[in-house]
Every structure is written in C-alpha cells, then in structure tokens.
Amino acid sequence: MLPPAIHLSLIPLLCILMKNCLAFKNDATEILYSHVVKPVSAHPSSNSTLNQARNGGRHFSSTGLDRNSRVQVGCRELRSTKYISDGQCTSISPLKELVCAGECLPLPVLPNWIGGGYGTKYWSRRSSQEWRCVNDKTRTQRIQLQCQDGSTRTYKITVVTACKCKRYTRQHNESSHNFESVSPAKPAQHHRERKRASKSSKHSLS
C-alpha cells in the first residue's frame, strides 16, 4: 500500500495523462476526417464527371471532339487508258487520263497512300455521305489521229490531272424542294379565277 501523500501526488499526473490521451484521440479523428473530406471538395461530383465515365472518359468540349473525329480525306483516283476515235480516224497512241470516283475516304484507307496528298481536307464519319469526289485540275493535250486514207488529224482534248473532295448539302441531292415550292401557288390562281367568275356572273344578272 502506498502512503496517502504519494496518492495525492499521482492525481495531477493522472489528470495530465488523461488530457494528453483525449488530445491524441481528437487529433486522430480530425486527421482521419480531413483525409476523407479533401478529395470530395477538390473534385466535386457532377453530371459531367458521370457522363465522362459513361462515354469512356471523353470531354464534352467541341474542340476535343472535332480533333478526334476529323481526319484528312482524299479522293479515290482511277487511271484509265483509252483510244480516241472520230469516224474512220483513231488515235495513234493511247490516252491516259485520271478518273475521279464518286466517294471520298480517309487518306490511310486510300491505295498508294504514302502520308500526303494534294487537296486534302478534313472528313467526319457522320458527314461521309455529303462529300463527293469531283474534277479539280485539267489540262489541254493534243493527240494525233490516224485515218484509214493515210491522213492524220490533230485534236485538242481536256484531260483531268487532279481530283478534290467537294461537300454537297442535302438541297443539292433533293430536287423535290423545287416542285414543292411551286405547287402551293396553283390553288391561289384557281381561287382568283373563281372570284372573277363570280363577279362576272353578278354583273350579268344585274
């Protein structure tokens, strides 16, 4: 058994130890809660973050979508070799010309693509049907035709040398808009003719 004087001296020590223990517990809980709260305040949850997860982490900025969806586009070019004839005269040597096909494709898909091309534009998958391959550059070439009687003729013809992609709107492909705009005007003319007929009948009766 300890003497009473020692008991009295141990009471302040116990009080100090209890205060330190409480302070340690409070510090631990504050650190724990601060660790949980900070990520929530730094990165608030919103609809955009949820949509990013659904869309594979893509952002909704228009520039980002345009850069990812646009690629260079070019025409599918075909080389043709043919002879020019006019009656009984035929060209001595075959004529080689470029034929522009009716579709535009991304450059990596085109045959003989080596990383560049003339007249390249940007192509979007959504608007692939609106692009058409048309003639871009032409030149005049002279050819000689050999006739059956031994005479020769010289002709000037236009040869395509380059193609380009041209974008067409829906109005270019749909010709029905012109007819629809003209058809509503016809009933108005009939209505005016009826008014004139009714007026003439009134004058005749009077």
Swiss-Prot record:
<feature type="compositionally biased region" description="Polar residues">
    <location>
        <begin position="43"/>
        <end position="62"/>
    </location>
</feature>
<dbReference type="InterPro" id="IPR006207">
    <property type="entry name" value="Cys_knot_C"/>
</dbReference>
<dbReference type="GO" id="GO:0030178">
    <property type="term" value="P:negative regulation of Wnt signaling pathway"/>
</dbReference>
<feature type="compositionally biased region" description="Basic residues">
    <location>
        <begin position="188"/>
        <end position="206"/>
    </location>
</feature>
<dbReference type="GO" id="GO:0030514">
    <property type="term" value="P:negative regulation of BMP signaling pathway"/>
</dbReference>
<dbReference type="InterPro" id="IPR008835">
    <property type="entry name" value="Sclerostin/SOSTDC1"/>
</dbReference>
<protein>
    <recommendedName>
        <fullName>Sclerostin domain-containing protein 1</fullName>
    </recommendedName>
</protein>
<dbReference type="GO" id="GO:0072148">
    <property type="term" value="P:epithelial cell fate commitment"/>
</dbReference>
<dbReference type="GO" id="GO:0005615">
    <property type="term" value="C:extracellular space"/>
</dbReference>
<feature type="signal peptide">
    <location>
        <begin position="1"/>
        <end position="23"/>
    </location>
</feature>
<feature type="disulfide bond">
    <location>
        <begin position="89"/>
        <end position="147"/>
    </location>
</feature>
<dbReference type="GO" id="GO:0010454">
    <property type="term" value="P:negative regulation of cell fate commitment"/>
</dbReference>
<feature type="domain" description="CTCK">
    <location>
        <begin position="75"/>
        <end position="170"/>
    </location>
</feature>
<keyword id="KW-0325">Glycoprotein</keyword>
<dbReference type="GO" id="GO:0090090">
    <property type="term" value="P:negative regulation of canonical Wnt signaling pathway"/>
</dbReference>
<dbReference type="GO" id="GO:0045662">
    <property type="term" value="P:negative regulation of myoblast differentiation"/>
</dbReference>
<dbReference type="GO" id="GO:0030509">
    <property type="term" value="P:BMP signaling pathway"/>
</dbReference>
<dbReference type="GO" id="GO:0007389">
    <property type="term" value="P:pattern specification process"/>
</dbReference>
<feature type="glycosylation site" description="N-linked (GlcNAc...) asparagine">
    <location>
        <position position="173"/>
    </location>
</feature>
<dbReference type="GO" id="GO:0031069">
    <property type="term" value="P:hair follicle morphogenesis"/>
</dbReference>
<dbReference type="GO" id="GO:0042475">
    <property type="term" value="P:odontogenesis of dentin-containing tooth"/>
</dbReference>
<comment type="subunit">
    <text>Interacts with BMP2, BMP4, BMP6 and BMP7 with high affinity.</text>
</comment>
<comment type="function">
    <text>Directly antagonizes activity of BMP2, BMP4, BMP6 and BMP7 in a dose-dependent manner. May be involved in the onset of endometrial receptivity for implantation/sensitization for the decidual cell reaction. Enhances Wnt signaling and inhibits TGF-beta signaling.</text>
</comment>
<feature type="disulfide bond">
    <location>
        <begin position="75"/>
        <end position="133"/>
    </location>
</feature>
<dbReference type="GO" id="GO:2000016">
    <property type="term" value="P:negative regulation of determination of dorsal identity"/>
</dbReference>
<feature type="disulfide bond">
    <location>
        <begin position="100"/>
        <end position="163"/>
    </location>
</feature>
<dbReference type="GO" id="GO:0098821">
    <property type="term" value="F:BMP receptor activity"/>
</dbReference>
<keyword id="KW-0964">Secreted</keyword>
<dbReference type="Pfam" id="PF05463">
    <property type="entry name" value="Sclerostin"/>
</dbReference>
<comment type="similarity">
    <text>Belongs to the sclerostin family.</text>
</comment>
<dbReference type="GO" id="GO:0036122">
    <property type="term" value="F:BMP binding"/>
</dbReference>
<dbReference type="GO" id="GO:0045165">
    <property type="term" value="P:cell fate commitment"/>
</dbReference>
<feature type="disulfide bond">
    <location>
        <begin position="104"/>
        <end position="165"/>
    </location>
</feature>
<feature type="region of interest" description="Disordered">
    <location>
        <begin position="176"/>
        <end position="206"/>
    </location>
</feature>
<feature type="glycosylation site" description="N-linked (GlcNAc...) asparagine">
    <location>
        <position position="47"/>
    </location>
</feature>
<dbReference type="GO" id="GO:0060070">
    <property type="term" value="P:canonical Wnt signaling pathway"/>
</dbReference>
<dbReference type="GO" id="GO:0007566">
    <property type="term" value="P:embryo implantation"/>
</dbReference>
<keyword id="KW-0732">Signal</keyword>
<keyword id="KW-1015">Disulfide bond</keyword>
<dbReference type="GO" id="GO:0060648">
    <property type="term" value="P:mammary gland bud morphogenesis"/>
</dbReference>
<dbReference type="InterPro" id="IPR029034">
    <property type="entry name" value="Cystine-knot_cytokine"/>
</dbReference>
<keyword id="KW-0879">Wnt signaling pathway</keyword>
